[in-house]
Amino acid sequence: MSNNIRIEEDLLGTREVPADAYYGVHTLRAIENFYISNNKISDIPEFVRGMVMVKKAAAMANKELQTIPKSVANAIIAACDEVLNNGKCMDQFPVDVYQGGAGTSVNMNTNEVLANIGLELMGHQKGEYQYLNPNDHVNKCQSTNDAYPTGFRIAVYSSLIKLVDAINQLREGFERKAVEFQDILKMGRTQLQDAVPMTLGQEFRAFSILLKEEVKNIQRTAELLLEVNLGATAIGTGLNTPKEYSPLAVKKLAEVTGFPCVPAEDLIEATSDCGAYVMVHGALKRLAVKMSKICNDLRLLSSGPRAGLNEINLPELQAGSSIMPAKVNPVVPEVVNQVCFKVIGNDTTVTMAAEAGQLQLNVMEPVIGQAMFESVHILTNACYNLLEKCINGITANKEVCEGYVYNSIGIVTYLNPFIGHHNGDIVGKICAETGKSVREVVLERGLLTEAELDDIFSVQNLMHPAYKAKRYTDESEQ
């Protein structure tokens, strides 16, 4: 045997494994069988950590129940700590994220890596599985069908905590701009038509509150992930486990993760059902819808600058055209739009894969995992990208904003309590026909005085409309 290889054996025969590899023959075959993408399990450190946490919890439970030798359990626990605390072997998970087998390749990859780390800690060589075996010891009282989804759930839950932090930081960025723009009057619009005045601060605060609602929704649905089927083994009957194992393993998992994990009410149902993933990714889709809408608004509000709304200025980040000089585009809102489109597409993937299970197992969980990890990852990055490269640098064109208000026919709505709806119709029609302002027409018709208009159209009143009429002209008067 060469110093560069070691021989390992499985159901299908013997294979040469690189001597320095911590993975084994099962992982090697998975590498050879699945070459779909350039994305590996190693590229998702949260997933690796989630799987290792499951293995640590299982080893702790097995140690307490004496289902494996104490020295072996201690070696597995120590191997898990090497990965969790020191990042050891995070590059030893080379299996493609797209894979058949319901996650068996990921589970065995984890078993092999931990077994070989444990063997070294015990003073043995990699591959000397007679002392510490990937199946008989690391995978004791487990099946891929409970270990894999439990590790996946822990990993997604951990990732969602980071996403929530990113959303909150973005929300705070909008809130800061809301305060900065609180006294800037602008025209509100419905159906892209002038409606009634508001402040730019109110518009940005609405963005902030919108994101606050999404945080609550994500946190609420994320709790579904903490109901796990650890101890279910193959189909949920708990085959080859002591009756005490499942609740004890889940208790140990809660200790290892720091999350309030609980056993599923029915392990057979939990092993076959993927409804929690549909719910959680649905929350991600809802966030994507809201973020995309915000970016649409930012692009529209900054449009122009000469022939658009031009109410706000986005930071100028790069030249916008290879042919048109001096053109700058809203590239960050555009990329966030695209992120949101991808997340919405991933939601369809999760939905179809969750529906595709048969009988006691859904073998499509790997693609659910790929979609969910990708969605959480790109949404997290999008929040920071939008905050740092766009929101923090937004400035307002106060004169433009206020000019739209005072030149708009829409502000005649504010005069309804003072001049009546019918007179408002007449004023609006004259403004549209002549191009005159509402103020000009109202004064010409003697409906209100300069002083009254100054009071009604003050920033304070437009921000907080007072409906108690100081003067009212009956609609019958002409």
From Swiss-Prot:
Its EC number is 4.3.1.1. Pathway: Amino-acid metabolism. The active site is at S321. It is an enzyme of class 4 (lyase). Disruption phenotype: Mutant shows decreased growth with L-aspartate as the sole nitrogen source. Changing K55C: Produced exclusively as an inclusion body, and only the higher molecular weight oligomers are observed. L-aspartate binds at T104, S143, T144, N145, T190, S322, K327. Induction: Expression is independent of the nitrogen regulatory system, and none of the nitrogen sources, including L-aspartate, influence aspA expression. Glucose represses the expression by fivefold. Expression is also regulated by the general stress response factor, sigma-38. Pfam families: FumaraseC_C, Lyase_1. Under nitrogen-limiting conditions, activity is regulated by a central regulator of nitrogen metabolism, GlnB, which interacts with AspA and stimulates its L-aspartate deaminase activity, but not the reverse amination reaction. AspA exists in a pH-dependent equilibrium between a higher pH form that has an absolute requirement for a divalent metal ion and for substrate activation, and a low pH form that does not require activation by either substrate or metal ions. It catalyses: L-aspartate = fumarate + NH4(+). One of its GO terms (biological process) is aspartate metabolic process. Keywords: Lyase. Catalyzes the reversible conversion of L-aspartate to fumarate and ammonia. In the reverse reaction, consumption of fumarate is observed in the presence of not only NH4(+), but also hydroxylamine (NH(2)OH). Is specific for L-aspartate and cannot use structural analogs of L-aspartate such as D-aspartate, DL-alpha-methylaspartate, DL-beta-methylaspartate, DL-threo-beta-hydroxy-aspartate, DL-erythro-beta-hydroxyaspartate, L-cysteate, L-alpha-aminobutyrate, L-asparagine, L-alanine or L-glutamate. Represents the central enzyme for nitrogen assimilation from L-aspartate in E.coli. Homotetramer. Dimer of dimers. Isolated dimers can have enzymatic activity. The dissociation process from tetramer to dimer is reversible but the dissociation process from dimer to monomer is not reversible. Interacts with the T-loop domain of the nitrogen regulatory protein GlnB (in the presence of the GlnB effectors ATP and 2-oxoglutarate) or with uridylylated GlnB (with or without effectors). This is Aspartate ammonia-lyase. The gene is aspA.
